[in-house]
């Protein structure tokens, strides 16, 4: 995981610094809604925080392990949340566009439609299409 200072900008794109934004969720606070969890997960990918990614993944769909780009070849370039909707009292969907580059290659755009579920007051990533 990358070191940071409290004033570093948050990778998720919100105006708050990392410590006041996604950093608090990476430290164990519960995300208040699915969009915030999705933003915190994006920031975890940027910072290569595998522990948070696995902890925020619903146990029914969580992989046993997650291998990220340990060589640091992937550079995350930005996040654009296109839609976040509650689909039930404890379910939600978030559609977002993330941009990244691998090595010196061209930037890639990835659109994802993610599903989330809340259990015992905590939101979890369920799956995506």
Swiss-Prot record:
- Entries under SUPFAM superfamilies matching the protein: NTF2-like
Instruction: Output the superkingdom of the source species.
Output: Bacteria
Family assignment? Belongs to the UPF0225 family.
Name this protein carries in UniProt: UPF0225 protein XCC4159
- What InterPro entries is this protein classified in? NTF2-like_dom_sf, SEC_C_motif, UPF0225, YchJ-like_M
Organism in which the protein naturally occurs: Xanthomonas campestris pv. campestris (strain ATCC 33913 / DSM 3586 / NCPPB 528 / LMG 568 / P 25)
Task: Identify the Pfam families for this entry.
Answer: SEC-C, YchJ_M-like
